[in-house]
Structure formats: C-alpha cells, structure tokens
C-alpha cells in the first residue's frame, strides 16, 4: 500500500525498525475500540485495523490528517478525526496507541496526552507502547547548549546507567526530579540521555533514525574521574527549556 505523506512523515515511514517494533506490539495487543493518538500518516491505525473492531485515528495537524484520511479511506473500521487529543471526547477505550515519543519524553506531548486519555481506558485496557526506559552516560563535549546526538558522535566517558522507567498504563508523572550516580573513566562535562521503548512485553526498541535520538545535556562544571552524582530534572512534555542538570 502506498501512503500519501508529508516529507517529514515520509522519513517516519522509512524508519523500518520503529515500524516493526510497533507493528509487532499492535498485532499482539490491539483489540476492541482502539484509539491512535497523534496518528500522523495513519500507518499505526492501518496496522491496528486488522486486529481491532474499530480504530479512531486522531491527528491535530490538518495537512497530515487529510493524508491519513486518504490513506485509510478503504478501511471500513477506521475513522480519521482532525482534532487535538488533549481536547477530544473519548469513548471507553480497549486500546490506546500513542507514539508521541521523544528522548526522556521531554519534547513531545506523550505524557500530557496520555494523562488525559487514560481516564477513558477500560480497566483491562492496553496502552501501546507499554513503557520507556531512560539511561544516562557521561560524555565530553565542546559546546554549551542542549542538543541531539543522533549519530552518537561524542565518545562516552563511562558506562550507561538506567535511571528511570515510565509505565504508560497507570499514574503518569509530569516531572522527573532525581539524582543519578555515574561512573566516569575520565573527566566529563555533559551527560547523554538515551531512551529505550518497550512497545509490548519482550519487544524493546532502542533509538532509531526517527525516534528518541540521544540527547546531550552540557553541565556547568566538569566532573572528575570516578563516581559522580548528577542532579537532574525536567518536565515531560515541557520542552528542552525545562531541563536542569548539575553536579552535586
């Protein structure tokens, strides 16, 4: 099937690792009334249509929503709604698919949208993806601003450590605030956050070309070799300006 898309969504469709992880999860978990939030081109709704009784694809951008409507027009059990999921009036849902992911859930609306949508999920309902694991590692950089490091161009100064797991089926926090201890093999002046997505039990997807690029957060001070404790906080869905990190 050939999809009509914008250039950006064409890149999303070309990220085969991302699509495979979601397709496998959807094939084993989607059922009943399924919502696809932030549906984009409609590809995940297309996957879900084979397994769910009814799929409602919600997309707030009118241009890509029109594309999704055209892409899914031949499927009798799929409807496309051009509306913001933060304001949509849901019916009781059996499955919620929401791929508004970003590294550590900082710069996309995955958490704000799900916090509202979960109020309408049945007690035995399912969320795809299931969870995200966030990890950090020390790195050395020659810049001062937060930036993505898609190609892992900055060498690591120590091992990666998982510092948080966010489960999407339950009470979602808006803010992460905590400390993490990193082991550095050499002095460092930044941390790199890497997120891994659990789309369903046993299906884990790391950063892909179009999902969760590693994020580098420079520090004002330089950390010494050995164990260093970092204070880290951010608002999920609050954007990169909400990030604060410092050496304790």
Swiss-Prot record:
It comes from Methanothermobacter thermautotrophicus (strain ATCC 29096 / DSM 1053 / JCM 10044 / NBRC 100330 / Delta H) (Methanobacterium thermoautotrophicum). Pfam families: Methyltransf_25. One of its GO terms (molecular function) is protein-arginine N-methyltransferase activity. PANTHER family: PROTEIN ARGININE N-METHYLTRANSFERASE, PROTEIN ARGININE N-METHYLTRANSFERASE 3. InterPro entries: Arg_MeTrfase (IPR025799), Methyltransf_25 (IPR041698), SAM-dependent_MTases_sf (IPR029063), UCP006607_RNA_methylase-rel (IPR021172). This is Uncharacterized protein MTH_738. To M.jannaschii MJ1452. Coiled coil: none annotated.
